[in-house]
Amino acid sequence: MVTALLTGCTGASPDSPIQKDTSMNVEQSHQDVLDIFAAVRSVVGQDGWGDEDPGWNLCGSDGEDAAQYTYASTRRLPLPGTADQVAEGVTRALAAIGYEGARVQHDTELTPERTVISYPKGYLGGTAADGFAIFFQAFDSYADVAIDGHCVPGRAPRFGEPLNPRPTDLP
């Protein structure tokens, strides 16, 4: 998922389409990321997701506690339509949960070419000021999503706590 790293870390621009209130707590930020993933799955398909990569980042400054939940997953099964149709469906699903303004773009430099969504600032445009970003890409029989949640005040859950289970604690 190297392309997800290319989104950068630039600040929000005046024309940024960010619609969400970022004054949420750690639990709400975690749930927001899960809601985004559920919206993507509702379009792409519920089954077949793998290579899951959940994690917590420390994002505070000057010794301040702040946390950011991240989640990425890949699906290697036939898409329920063309990559463009699926991506358009993902933009509608994101809008339905409050993330209006996501747009479908294309990366013709990669092989195979990809249909991409990068929110809030467009493909390779960076993240919101608080590090928030959604990256989605699709091509024949492949889709992946990477979500960098909002950086919110509070302590990141310790390994083994309910919002950060050890692999052996999972159902």
Where are these regions (language model features)?
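Sec-dependent N-terminal signal peptides
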Residues: M1-V2
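C-terminal motif of bacterial Sec signal peptides marking the signal peptidase cleavage site
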Residues: L5-G8
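Bacterial signal peptide processing site
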Residues: T10-P14
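Secreted/processed peptides and extracellular or luminal domains of membrane proteins
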Residues: D15, D65-A66, P157
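Extracytoplasmic/periplasmic, Sec-exported soluble proteins
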Residues: D21-D32, P78-T82, V86
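Extracellularly exposed regions in secreted/surface proteins, prominently low-complexity, repeat-rich
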Residues: E27-V43, G125-P171
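Compositionally biased P/S/T/G-rich terminal and signal peptide-adjacent segments
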Residues: E27-Y71
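Long, charged/polar, surface-exposed segments that mediate recognition or autoinhibition
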Residues: A67-P120
